[in-house]
Design a protein with these regions (language model features):
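Conserved small/polar residues in nucleotide/adenosyl-binding loops
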Residues: 232-240
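Conserved ABC transporter NBD signature motif
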Residues: 13-21
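ABC ATPase nucleotide-binding domains
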Residues: 31-33, 37, 41, 45-182
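Conserved coupling/switch loops of ABC nucleotide-binding domains, chiefly the family-specific signature
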Residues: 11-14, 164
């Protein structure tokens, strides 16, 4: 995300945005907003000043600034805290302030690095519903990094599953969820976590690789060694 924002340089490759190569574009010329997992606010500014800061440097009139700050503050439950300083806020309130500062600006690109991670459960659930609606009204691209499958499903759009910086699968979120192309993508959306076991198939016989448990299988697959997902359901538990 820092590379997309222009804060870090790529070691290789290029960055394209809206059909343009922006690899060498300076940070100041990238109309981008970013929220880190760890909140970052100006300690000497009030909540209002923190949220309004990206608007003031663009020369927007004070009345419009006040209106925009008011709307995003109401959305993020910050209206009663606009005159407070960051050190007077809880961790969740500080994260909401950082999120409000990113949303108040008409950015072409919004980068969100687990923005709901430090919020309490109730507000997290509320924002999961509100954020997609907010993004729909904006003519911008939103990149949302998360380790929570429920966040990805609620936000919608397209999803890329990553492993060690490499894209494993990319597509519509529901397509990735319903039709994972590999075990890694399947694990991402697995709740509860999957139980993975290695088996060996010879003819109609299957057995676990690490023990002597065997069974008959009519699966139409070639003989060989495979990894399978074991599903434990409440019905199976009831049957003992």
């Amino acid at each position: 995300m820092k590379i997309m924002a222009g804060l870090d340089k790529p070691t290789s490759g290029e960055i394209w945005f809206d059909g343009k190569n922006v690899t060498g574009t300076k940070v100041q010329k990238r109309n981008c907003s970013m929220v880190y997992q760890q909140f970052i606010n100006y300690p000497n500014f009030s909540v209002y000043e923190n949220i309004a800061s990206p608007l003031k440097i663009t020369g927007i009139k004070s009345d419009e600034i006040k209106e925009r700050v008011g709307k995003v503050a109401e959305l993020l439950k910050l209206s009663a805290m606009l005159n407070k300083k960051p050190d007077e806020l809880s961790g969740g309130q500080q994260q909401r302030t950082a999120l409000a500062r990113a949303l108040v600006k008409d950015s072409d690109l919004i980068l969100l690095d687990e923005p709901l991670a430090n919020l309490d459960f109730k507000l997290r659930e509320e924002l999961r519903e509100e954020l997609p609606k907010l993004f729909e009204d904006r003519d911008c691209i939103v990149v949302y990094a998360t380790t929570e499958p429920s966040d990805a499903l609620m936000i919608g759009g397209n999803t890329a599953t990553l492993l060690e910086g490499k894209v494993i699968q990319y597509g519509k979120t529901l397509e990735v969820y319903n039709k994972p192309e590999n075990l890694i993508s399947a694990k991402v959306f697995s709740d509860p976590p999957m139980n993975i076991a290695e088996i060996t198939k010879r003819g109609d016989n299957c057995k676990f690789t690490d023990n002597d448990v065997q069974w008959k299988s009519s699966a139409k697959i070639k003989d060989g060694t495979y990894k399978i997902c074991l599903l434990y359901t409440s019905d199976a538990a009831d049957e003992g």
